[in-house]
Amino acid sequence: FCCPFIRYCCW
């Protein structure tokens, strides 16, 4: 999952 508007937020 990656946040749509935050860059380094994938896990």
Swiss-Prot record:
Expressed by the venom duct. It is found in: Secreted. It comes from the Eukaryota. GO terms for molecular function: toxin activity. The keyword Phosphoprotein does not apply. Belongs to the conotoxin T superfamily. The cysteine framework is V (CC-CC). Causes dorsal fins drooping in fish. No effect is observed when injected into mice. This is Conotoxin au5a. It comes from Conus aulicus. The lineage of its organism: Eukaryota, Metazoa, Spiralia, Lophotrochozoa, Mollusca.
